[in-house]
């Protein structure tokens, strides 16, 4: 009996391995639009897909970022400046994409643009702090997607949304985790709706990687600005030791960040060119072995773990 079971399991994984490695043909005819290509995942993915031969349409926030990217890629790659928080900028970029792809449609849309700041305990933040992140990470994703869906549907293509392990388990305050939970929900509903048209939707859920989003210097600068503007009552409740512990946790976070960004961009590439893409991709060992399992744990257990490892306020009970 155990032999039959072992054979069955072996055949299952062999079939899974084979399906995972089937790649689409005619990649050179397929257009992919990527947001957030100034640096990090977006920039590396644009270079990676360009080397693969795909027609990359790269959106950068700044002209400087676009110029740098063009200098590192082939003449086939084209760039456009895009601020995902401004509807008029999104509309202009969508029109540009439409002119580029013409009747072929848009094979791939990668919503990669994102920010992580301001981040701090919720009580220290304002409504505008939440809006700042949600405008980019969630509403920007929605605006870009809705503007380009007709082109993706025409090509029966792919939508790839960059979420995070923090879209599976919320470990700190501020708009970042909220925005990623929103991306997960938007992607789930979008996947079901677009399945009728042959369009596939995938989510990338990276762990901690060394990018501008996880920059210790930016994180600490933002946090100290938030702390300085906080009310005396809040400062008294949290205390200076909390600030010191928060700084220390930021430094530890940066040390734990994975530097190999290709672990994420390879997932993005697979979602775009595989015959059988996954629905979700957990990128990084911390995502696979720590945060993803945490998302399935009982809530009380996750709360207990976070209570134990997080900085403690001065007036904690």
Curated annotation (Swiss-Prot):
This is Retinol dehydrogenase 16. GO terms for cellular component: endoplasmic reticulum membrane; intracellular membrane-bounded organelle. Pathway: Cofactor metabolism; retinol metabolism. The lineage of its organism: Eukaryota, Metazoa, Chordata, Craniata, Vertebrata. The C-terminal region plays a crucial role in controlling the activity of RDH16 and its required for endoplasmic reticulum (ER) retention. It comes from Homo sapiens. The active site is at 176 (proton acceptor). PANTHER family: RETINOL DEHYDROGENASE 16 (PTHR43313:SF11), SHORT-CHAIN DEHYDROGENASE/REDUCTASE FAMILY 9C (PTHR43313). Homodimer. Keywords: Endoplasmic reticulum, Lipid metabolism, Membrane, Microsome, NAD, Oxidoreductase, Steroid metabolism, Transmembrane, Transmembrane helix. Oxidoreductase with a preference for NAD. Oxidizes all-trans-retinol, 9-cis-retinol, 11-cis-retinol and 13-cis-retinol to the corresponding aldehydes. Has higher activity towards CRBP-bound retinol than with free retinol. Also oxidizes 3-alpha-hydroxysteroids. Oxidizes androstanediol and androsterone to dihydrotestosterone and androstanedione. Can also catalyze the reverse reaction. Highly expressed in adult liver (at protein level). Detected in endometrium, liver and foreskin. Detected in the spineous layers of adult skin, and at lower levels in basal and granular skin layers. Detected in fetal liver and lung. The keyword Signal does not apply. The keyword Membrane applies. Inhibited by citral, perillyl alcohol, geraniol, farnesol and geranyl geraniol. Induction: Transiently up-regulated by retinoic acid.
């Amino acid at each position: 009996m155990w032999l039959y079971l072992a054979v069955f399991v072996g055949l299952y994984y062999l079939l899974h391995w084979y399906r995972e490695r089937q790649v689409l043909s005619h990649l050179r005819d397929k257009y992919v639009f990527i947001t957030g290509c100034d640096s990090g995942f977006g920039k590396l993915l644009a270079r990676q897909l360009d080397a693969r031969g795909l027609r990359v349409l790269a959106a950068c926030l700044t002209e400087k970022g676009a110029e740098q990217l063009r200098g590192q890629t082939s003449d086939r790659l084209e760039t456009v400046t895009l601020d995902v928080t401004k509807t008029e900028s999104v509309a202009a970029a969508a029109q540009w994409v439409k002119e580029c792809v013409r009747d072929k449609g848009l094979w791939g849309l990668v919503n990669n643009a994102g920010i992580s700041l301001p981040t701090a305990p919720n009580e220290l933040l304002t409504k505008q702090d939440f809006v700042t992140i949600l405008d980019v990470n969630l509403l920007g994703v929605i605006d870009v997607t809705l503007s380009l869906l007709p082109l993706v549907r025409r090509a029966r293509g792919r939508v790839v949304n960059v979420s995070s392990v923090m879209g599976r388990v919320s470990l700190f305050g501020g708009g970042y985790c909220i925005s990623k939970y929103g991306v997960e929900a938007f992607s789930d509903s979008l996947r079901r709706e677009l399945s009728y048209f042959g369009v596939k939707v995938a989510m990338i859920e990276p762990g901690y990687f060394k990018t501008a989003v996880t920059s210790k210097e930016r994180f600490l600068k933002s946090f100290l600005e938030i702390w300085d503007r906080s009310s005396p009552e809040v400062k008294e409740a949290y205390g200076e030791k909390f600030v010191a512990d928060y700084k220390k946790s930021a430094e530890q976070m940066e040390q734990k960040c994975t530097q190999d960004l290709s672990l994420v961009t390879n997932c993005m590439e697979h979602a775009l060119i595989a015959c059988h893409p996954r629905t979700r991709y957990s990128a990084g060992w911390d995502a696979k072995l720590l945060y993803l399992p945490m998302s399935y744990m009982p809530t009380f257990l996750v709360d207990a773990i976070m209570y134990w490892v997080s900085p403690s306020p001065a007036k904690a009970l």
